[in-house]
Amino acid sequence: MKLQLVAVGTKMPDWVQTGFLDYIKRFPKDMPFELTEVPAGKRGKNADIRRILEREGELMLAAVGKGNRIVTLDIPGKPWDTPALAGQLERWKQDGRDVSLLIGGPEGLAPTCKGAAEQSWSLSPLTLPHPLVRVLVAESLYRAWSITANHPYHRE
């Protein structure tokens, strides 16, 4: 199974790149984790946010692999603690499909992305900065994998 993070935004600070890469390089060969970035729409004083969201959603869904399970990262999603996420990871592996996790831009996800999702995951009831979410998702999934693989990274 391959994990794909599809995220709005292409210019992340160095600390985001460093943190994200630190975790994704730890994943085993049979579970590669890749990042696909889509450009954020130009936002300004008179920007049509609905159209920007719509376009970002089109780009995100076009980046998702055919047949992939789509999981959105969204505040109203299900809050999974670490053991629950490990269980989700196991179920995704048993399903046999690749998984695409979608992170929206500053205004969130397009309705088309939410509609295409089979699941929605809430990292926190807090509004988190989108760059930070990339690192949190990578670490959380690595920790979940470590539980399923009996790797010593996660400690109770």
UniProtKB/Swiss-Prot annotation:
Keyword match Cytoplasm: yes
Question: Which parts of the sequence bind S-adenosyl-L-methionine?
Answer: 73, 104, 123-128
The record's subcellular location field reads: Cytoplasm
EC annotation from Swiss-Prot or TrEMBL: 2.1.1.177
Q: Which reaction does it catalyse?
A: pseudouridine(1915) in 23S rRNA + S-adenosyl-L-methionine = N(3)-methylpseudouridine(1915) in 23S rRNA + S-adenosyl-L-homocysteine + H(+)
What are the protein's UniProt keywords? Cytoplasm, Methyltransferase, rRNA processing, S-adenosyl-L-methionine, Transferase
UniProt GO MF annotations: rRNA (pseudouridine-N3-)-methyltransferase activity
The record's section on InterPro entries has:
Alpha/beta_knot_MTases, RlmH-like, tRNA_m1G_MTases_N
| Broad class of where this protein is predominantly found | cytoplasm
Q: What class of enzyme is it?
A: transferase
A Pfam family in this protein?
SPOUT_MTase
Q: Does the keyword field hold Transcription?
A: no
GO annotations of cellular component type: cytoplasm
Q: Which family is it part of?
A: Belongs to the RNA methyltransferase RlmH family.
In UniProt terms, what function does this protein have?
A: Specifically methylates the pseudouridine at position 1915 (m3Psi1915) in 23S rRNA.
Q: PANTHER family annotated for this entry? A: METHYLTRANSFERASE, RIBOSOMAL RNA LARGE SUBUNIT METHYLTRANSFERASE H
> What is annotated about its quaternary structure and interactions?
Homodimer.
Name of this protein: Ribosomal RNA large subunit methyltransferase H
Q: Which gene encodes it?
A: rlmH
